[in-house]
């Protein structure tokens, strides 16, 4: 009985094993031998297949949506590629004031389109210039902050982060020592970094006088429609600022490399002579005259007598030094207490012109080139047409001269003004500050001495025109800097070929790239979580009565 029973048990065990083995095999390799008795083996492969199809479908949809979003960005919302308005900000750190320029422009057919009027251009100037804060660099932050707020009011807030702001300081800052320059620039960088605009430290700098002249030439020829055309049909620029004068024009004459600049627009290359004559601006030259007068080194401007009476030929007769003028001259004065008693206004235009010429020729004996017109600096012969800007224009306008007035007209106007009694001049122009009114005698003489006596422009030559704008475009070097910078960047992008649109879109709109990558990833994650949530939780148990495994769903 025991043996029989034992055999029976073994037989039953063998029978059970026979029943169980297929099920075990199906669990391990359900793809090879599916069984209708096992829910697990029937549903598992179909679940995997369905899940893969679902993920593939959702992934494809995500990619399609991303591509559609990209196309939409390029054609519509990424309008920088299709002509929507961009902005740029340039701050001109001049010698007498700081001016901010806010530009709006478009890119059409891969080229920048500029319109310096209406909503596309705004500017604001505050006094004094940055160089006035040499003893208090932190004081520069007040005016710079006000200028930045002005710009932020002209640029939509959503575009601040992609709007470049640059500060370019000129002659006033160039006169300062480098450590002082850096302190003021450090304050400027701190203000611009916190402005909300796109800014880098190197975008706040003191530019060279040569750069300033080139930028002025660029905006002048852009305004006249000659930029990008025949070099021989371009117009030269002569600027008379407060601290410096700039001369820039196309020249075929061989010149030392330090005076030569080469720039390109489109397929045209221009070889320019460009130089800034520091200390030869109108205000700086007038101060030189005063310095020579006070030091008694300038015989034509100073006529000392035994009573030490100093005569200024460029001051209209009847003029007496006021407190402000004495304060301005305090740095040059050796005997301040006696200045008021020893000063005499000469009111002599001819002597004033001679004094101005002496200032312009100062240093000629040190010339190391074949020809030097101003000081010891090489200057080629002027050719073509010229625009005389800034103080050339202001002086011409003050005397009521037209844009094409001859230099002989300037002489006549200067002679009348210098010879007039000061009291009568004050009555004619009561709104002008006394110091500004005083300078017009010297200015008229200095202009003739610079353009005719020094640069050789005939007195009746019509090649020269006095203007501060051409059409409705201001002839401001800052506009030229903006034009050249934008044109250069655009041409560089165009040179990169098919990647231009990609760079333009994603460099200016980084959020577009984030969306393009993020949307498909987000959708894929969401689908994964949903399928994970909807995936049935299965539990496998062994049924002793039926002698098989049973797979059940857990809720």
From Swiss-Prot:
Record: active site: 212
MF term (GO), any: ATP binding
Residues that bind ATP: 89-99, 236-246
Reactions performed catalytically: a ribonucleoside 5'-triphosphate + 2 H2O = a ribonucleoside 5'-phosphate + 2 phosphate + 2 H(+)
CDD domains reported for this sequence: ASKHA_NBD_AtAPY3-like (cd24042)
Biased amino acid composition, Basic residues: 1-10
Coiled coil: none
The keyword ATP-binding belongs to this UniProt entry's keyword annotation: yes
Record keyword Transmembrane present: yes
GO biological process: anther dehiscence; pollen exine formation
Necessary cofactors: Ca(2+)
Keyword tags: ATP-binding, Calcium, Cytoplasmic vesicle, Glycoprotein, Hydrolase, Membrane, Nucleotide-binding, Transmembrane, Transmembrane helix
Glycosylation sites: 267, 348
Chain positions covered by the region annotation Disordered: 1-45
Polar residues composition-biased segments: 28-45
Role noted for this protein: Catalyzes the hydrolysis of phosphoanhydride bonds of nucleoside tri- and di-phosphates. Involved in the regulation of pollen and anther development.
Family according to the record: Belongs to the GDA1/CD39 NTPase family.
PANTHER family: ADENOSINE/GUANOSINE DIPHOSPHATASE, APYRASE 6-RELATED
Identification of the protein by name: Probable apyrase 6
Source organism of the structure: Arabidopsis thaliana
Gene (UniProt): APY6
